[in-house]
Amino acid sequence: MGTYAIIETGGEQLRVEPGRFYDARCFASLNPRILSANAKILIHRVLMIRRESTTNLGHPWLRNAIVRGRILHSCYGEKITIYKMHSKKKVRRKLGYRQKLVRFVVDSISSNGEEFFD
């Protein structure tokens, strides 16, 4: 079992590992103009870091813990269909929605100045 961290971004918690890419709903702290490809990001909302057999838990977040990464590109999630119908009224409405996502890759996880790569 390698090094991983649990971060909070876009209203959800993600288990991230260095060298892998993930899709997040949004980065609330970033301006949409900054969300270009290869933009570097720092995520400070780190809930937990696991390195080999040691586990560091935050309450609610870890101090001096940073997940460094870069944005690959923005994309859309799967389309969901919303269908509203009023019975006996001939009222039907069908809508589609696709969530805007940002795909980012995690470069490193650091805690108290010590960087973890895999």
UniProtKB/Swiss-Prot annotation:
One term of GO molecular function: rRNA binding
InterPro entries, A to Z: bL21-like, bL21-like_sf, Ribosomal_bL21
Coiled-coil portions: none
One Pfam family this sequence matches: Ribosomal_L21p
Sorted UniProt keywords: Chloroplast, Plastid, Ribonucleoprotein, Ribosomal protein, RNA-binding, rRNA-binding
GO (cellular component) term, any one: ribonucleoprotein complex
Chief location bin: plastid
Domain of life: Eukaryota
PANTHER family (alphabetical): 50S RIBOSOMAL PROTEIN L21 (PTHR21349), LARGE RIBOSOMAL SUBUNIT PROTEIN BL21M (PTHR21349:SF0)
Primary role: This protein binds to 23S rRNA.
Assembly description: Part of the 50S ribosomal subunit.
Protein name (database record): Large ribosomal subunit protein bL21c
